[in-house]
Amino acid sequence: MKLLMLCREPNLYSCRRLKMTAENAGHKMDILDPNRFLLKIQENRPHFALYYQPNQGTPYLLPDYDAVIPRFGTQSTKMGCSVLTHLAAKNIPCLNNPASFALARDKWLSLQALAAANIAVPVTVFAGQDFQAGSAVEKVSSPTILKTLNGSQGIGVILADRSQSAVSIMETLTLSHIPVLLQDFIGEAGASDIRCFVIGDKVVAAMQRSGQKGEFRANCHRGGITQQITLSDDEKLIAVRAAQALGLDVAGVDLIQSKKGLLVLEVNASPGLEMIEKTSGIDVATQMIAYLEKKIAGL
Ligand SMILES: Nc1ncnc2c1ncn2[C@@H]1O[C@H](COP(=O)(O)OP(=O)(O)O)[C@@H](O)[C@H]1O
Ligand SMILES: [Mg+2]
């Protein structure tokens, strides 16, 4: 098969692993930067054309691919999802599909979708820019978490110890036209959460993450320490339901243990492979490529 990965940094562990694994399975894989595409909608068939601007040389018409794996970061969500939509319109299987990918990249819309599917999430509010910050902050508990809608790797997640701090941070962000959601802080989790790697209807690997000393964010990119973990059936079920609620084939589901029970913090559409493979000892890349092969075959 001829596979395409959409990614700006081909040297990242996840990209290298996926490319190597695909090639070992006898496939060819090109890695292209979504920001180097030109997308065209035209009258004549094929209605959807794509051109690519290589590093050196002139742009060329994109050849056909059998499937595409989106692995672009949050800085490229808009163009990346546009490229993905164009490829999906040409009936090229996408791991994940463009609508689900875009939904997962918006923290508020995805929490709404999770709640609509009866999946427990932390109490969260999203206020319009003209809603009084003080009244918005009163709707959640203190200390309060504030999150920008499309942050990642822990960036854009803020802990305000006092209500007054939450109000001033919210006012500052709103004035800067940065939409933000407010959320109950789950302090009882002790800066730990669980990352579940879901492929299809299975959790293929999981790990516990704990924030380093003095840090409430458990993200590996923020220095979080990882540990092997065996999930209960209940935890597995919630993770798979969360991925399915957003329509994702591949997802990194973050779970947090609160005093009210297990909650879904967020669902990532392009979860990293490095720490989950190294911590769990499971070859996640091979399972992703095997799943993609089945998807291409229409199984
Ligand atoms: N409501 C919360 N209560 C306690 N900790 C939280 C909460 N929300 C996020 N965190 C911590 O911050 C980390 C990053 O938050 P998350 O919503 O997953 O955003 P990101 O996309 O940046 O990973 C989580 O892994 C968790 O450790
Ligand atoms: Mg996260």
From Swiss-Prot:
GO cellular component, one term: cytoplasm
Residue numbers binding ATP: K147, D184, F185, D193, R217, A218, N219
Entry-linked HAMAP family: RimK (MF_01552)
Family indicated by similarity: Belongs to the RimK family.
Molecular function GO terms recorded: ATP binding; metal ion binding; ribosomal S6-glutamic acid ligase activity
Cross-referenced SUPFAM superfamilies: Glutathione synthetase ATP-binding domain-like
Any Pfam family: Rimk_N
Broad class of enzyme this protein falls into: ligase
Sequence positions that bind Mg(2+) 2: E266, N268
Gene: rimK
Organism: Mannheimia succiniciproducens (strain KCTC 0769BP / MBEL55E)
Coiled coil: none
Classification via Gene3D superfamilies: 3.40.50.20, ATP-grasp fold, A domain (3.30.1490.20), ATP-grasp fold, B domain (3.30.470.20)
Descriptive protein name: Probable alpha-L-glutamate ligase
